[in-house]
Amino acid sequence: MTKPIAVVIGATSKWQSDGRNTRMVHGGNIPDDELPLSIRWGVGGAIALKFAREGFHVVLTTRSKPNASALEAAIYSEGLDCMTVELDLESDDSISTAFETVRSELGDPEVVVLNAGYLEGRDLPPEMELLENMPVELFETAQNISSRGPFLVA
């Protein structure tokens, strides 16, 4: 019997030890081993680990495969199954290619978790925090990631 498949869209977090937002909040680099495994990759990583531990073959999606390498290694280290597929929610072709890869290598997913987010604009200078000051390009990207992309995934 094959394992059920869970695709986690947005499986990696921008709050990794070398991430821009981690440095912004904590004032410097934090070694990975100082971040507990349970929070190292944020909600997406926690969801991926949970599904893997429950017997699913987990597909980690991220815009760049290296972003998921540590999470993938952690899942493999527990003897669990996963694979990483590049997926950019702003690209129709990327979405199609990612799911073609999943289907050809594993089969149809039973679960798709939409966890992608977009942080830009949250760290605008205080004098620009109002929505009216947000550049239209940031708004369009946020809409593509949170609305249009998931629609295309479905």
Task: Kindly label every feature range from the protein language model.
Residues 98, 113, 142, 153-154:
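Hydrophobic positions on the long internal alpha-helix
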Residues 1-59:
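Canonical Rossmann dinucleotide-binding motif of NAD(H)/NADP(H)-dependent dehydrogenases/reductases
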Residues 66, 86-98, 136:
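The beta1-alpha1 cofactor-binding region of Rossmann-like NAD(H)/NADP(H)-dependent oxidoreductases
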Residues 8-10, 114-115, 146, 154:
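Structural signature of the Rossmann-like NAD(P)-dependent dehydrogenase/reductase core
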Residues 82-84:
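Hydrophobic/aromatic anchor residues within beta-strands of the central parallel beta-sheet
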Residues 115-127:
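Conserved NAD(P)H cofactor-binding loop of Rossmann-fold oxidoreductase domains
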Residues 110, 118, 132-151:
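Catalytic Tyr-X3-Lys loop
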Residues 102-108:
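Glycine-rich phosphate-binding loop signature in dinucleotide/nucleotide-binding domains
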